[in-house]
A protein has these predicted regions:
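Zn2+-dependent peptidoglycan hydrolase active-site motif and core
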Residues: 35-72, 98
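Surface-exposed, glycine-biased beta-strand/turn segments
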Residues: 1-49
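Short, acidic/hydrophobic/Gly-rich beta-strand patch recurrent on exposed beta strands
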Residues: 22-25, 52-57, 101-103
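Conserved, short, structured surface segments that act as functional micro-motifs
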Residues: 77-122
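Conserved beta-strand positions that form and line the central face of beta-propeller blades
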Residues: 23, 54, 64, 87, ...
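Short, well-structured beta-strand-loop connectors
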Residues: 31-40, 73-88
């Protein structure tokens, strides 16, 4: 698996608070990368979370990337692990600064991305 972006975590995964993601602080237009080979199943603008892209991977895994400045792939595209799929931004009503809101789902259940990735820049 390939980390989508590197940077400090501003808000961790928290089931009790229904924050099914990690928020990774990044600079504007940081390349956002696919965590694994997959297919784009959603690539659109949403009012609350800005430009969103969702990838479907093997073994029932979905990866979700929100608040992007732009998307470089469209629905139906195949992507490779580490391929740039978006640029980081601060889009959508719920964004509080430049960051990547990154979700990982397995068989319909949210997973803590920090159990699978090291987001540290060191």
């Amino acid at each position: 698996l390939f980390p989508p972006a590197l940077g400090p975590i501003s808000q961790p995964f928290d089931l009790k608070e229904s924050h099914f993601a990690v928020d990774i602080v990044v600079k504007e237009n940081t390349p956002i990368k696919a965590i694994a080979d997959g297919t784009v199943i959603f690539s659109e603008w949403t009012a609350e979370t800005g430009y969103v892209i969702i990838l479907e991977h093997s073994s029932g895994i979905l990866s979700v990337y929100k608040h992007n400045a732009s998307l470089t792939k469209k629905q139906g595209d195949s992507v490779l692990s580490g391929e740039v799929i978006a640029t980081a931004g601060n889009t959508g009503e719920l964004s509080t600064g430049f960051h990547l809101h990154f979700e990982l789902w397995m068989d319909g259940y949210p997973m803590n991305p920090e159990n699978f990735f090291n987001f540290s820049e060191e």
